[in-house]
Amino acid sequence: MTALVEVVILTYMKTRFFLDNLPPFIMTHPTCSLICSLVHFDRGYEANHLRRAIAETADFNVDGLCNFRLQEVMQNWSEVAELASRLVSSTERDTYDVASFITSTEGAKNRIAIDHGRVFNLTEGREVQILPVFEEYEYNLIMAIVGQNPKEIIVEHTNLSNEMMSTLKHVAGVVYRN
């Protein structure tokens, strides 16, 4: 149950939080990479905080967890959203630079493969779940990949848009094989 609550709060709700608290923008690959970087930023700290909050409560009321037991985490999200708000209207390069910086602070360590549209963490020897967070498949792919702290991304037997390939190159080193 804890893993499910973690996914709901730290992926879906955190994504929704940033989408609701950034100035209006058109979703593009660069802004998606920024949002995904923000969502995965501080994931370890937030997951530990959430586990402690769950252990101390008798029920799994998500609103109660967020509004009372996770106030410190939610305040951090607000501060990050405020800082990121200035980037939404920045250039594509600035957006990618900040997204790359945020991602790199979590420590790039994994080799990732995209093969036939599926994502694999080669370092950990497992398939990565691609959650349906956004309406567009490539944006969900960005979310899945950024969450793996990639140092290298191998793309095989998968046709991705030029924008997606450009985004991946800003996230980590890319090897393209067909």
Language-model regions, residue ranges each:
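C-terminal structured domains
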Residues: 117-178
